[in-house]
């Protein structure tokens, strides 16, 4: 007898994955140059030269240790490098103990959800959203509550969130820049959201956690992307280098439990426990050390900006109405 829920997930893979697989078949049939695949988020920009150089140097310098285990939360030197980067960039008191290296943002999200919820809790997601959120929420034994974004600007709908947040709410997942529409939450919008959370915490007598899904943070076109922990301290940031360094297949990222929250150490301990329970041994070791060497490497968004300009101009000329993507 197999697990019915897991069988269902395996029997009906995500539409994104199905389209990606179909695209691979068509590329083999008619040539990759004739297939425009908008399904999965594979970057079209190669990884920076600094990444290749780091890999080559590491293969020469650390052959014996490079493929061994690290602590579950990651190499302490790499956690320190990530914490230093967060502190420099966002002016927050980031400590390495609050950084947990992960196999991409997906692992960080699954761990974070399990760390701050109990079975029967509710987790709010903002529509439109990445479909796998619902899978990870369900796996934690929680109910998924969908709240549509405000249309047409796709900002957080504060009134709708006020109605949705209730006694069972444990966490809200934010994704800015948003996948799939590319909207970026403004500082004003996030501040209104934080004020709502403060009121709701007092009203409900429970802590409300924000899980900020940030794989597209670097892929923006001039828009400010406020750092969520600076607006709402009770935030876990899930970051990935899949887009910023064009490394989706290497599965490397981190989650950062904001030092600004009053229960940061408790949450970090729960994160470690959730990682253990979900079977995450450690993030890929070679690329832990690669990101430490490439932590300040800038993202090349020129090709994405050109694609955006081409598509938005063409669609506008055809009479389509849309929100111009600010990122992703």
Task: Locate predicted features.
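N-terminal small-domain helix-loop-helix segment of the aminotransferase-like
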Residues: 2-104, 111, 294-301
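Alpha-helix termini
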Residues: 25-31, 89-91, 196-208, 259-265
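Short beta-strand
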Residues: 35-37, 238, 321-326
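Amphipathic alpha-helix from the class-I
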Residues: 57-61, 257-262, 283-303
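Conserved core of the PLP fold type I
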Residues: 63-202, 217-232, 236
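Active-site PLP attachment segment
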Residues: 227-267
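Active-site region of PLP-dependent enzymes
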Residues: 245-249, 264-289
């Amino acid at each position: 007898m197999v697990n019915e829920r897991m069988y269902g997930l395996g029997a009906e893979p995500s539409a994104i994955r199905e389209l990606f697989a179909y695209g691979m078949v068509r590329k083999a049939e008619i040539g990759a140059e004739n297939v425009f695949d908008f399904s999965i988020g594979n970057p079209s920009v190669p990884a920076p030269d600094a990444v290749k150089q780091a890999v080559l140097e590491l293969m020469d310098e650390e052959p014996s240790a490079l493929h061994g285990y690290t602590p579950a939360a990651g190499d302490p030197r790499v956690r320190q490098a990530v914490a230093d980067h967060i502190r420099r960039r966002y002016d927050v008191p980031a400590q390495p103990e609050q950084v947990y290296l992960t196999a991409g943002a997906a692992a960080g999200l699954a761990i974070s959800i399990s760390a701050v919820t109990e079975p029967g809790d509710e987790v709010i997601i903002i529509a439109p959203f990445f479909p796998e959120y619902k899978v990870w929420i369900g796996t934690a034994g929680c109910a998924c509550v969908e709240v549509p974004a405000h249309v047409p600007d796709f900002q957080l709908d504060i009134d709708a969130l006020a109605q949705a947040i209730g006694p069972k709410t444990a966490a809200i997942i934010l994704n800015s820049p948003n996948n799939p529409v590319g909207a970026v939450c403004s500082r004003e919008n996030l501040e209104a959201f934080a004020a709502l959370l403060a009121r709701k915490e007092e009203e409900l007598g429970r802590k409300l956690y924000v899980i900020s899904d940030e794989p597209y943070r670097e892929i923006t076109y001039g828009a400010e992307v406020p750092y969520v922990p600076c607006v709402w301290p009770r935030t876990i940031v899930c970051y990935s280098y899949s887009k910023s360094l064009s490394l989706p297949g290497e599965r490397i990222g981190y989650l950062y439990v904001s030092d600004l929250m009053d229960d940061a150490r408790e949450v970090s301990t729960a994160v470690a426990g959730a990682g253990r329970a979900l079977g995450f041994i450690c993030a890929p070791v070679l690329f832990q050390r690669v990101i430490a060497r490439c932590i300040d490497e800038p993202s090349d968004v020129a090709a994405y900006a050109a694609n955006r300009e081409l598509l938005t101009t063409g669609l506008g000329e055809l009479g389509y109405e849309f929100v111009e993507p600010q990122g992703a």
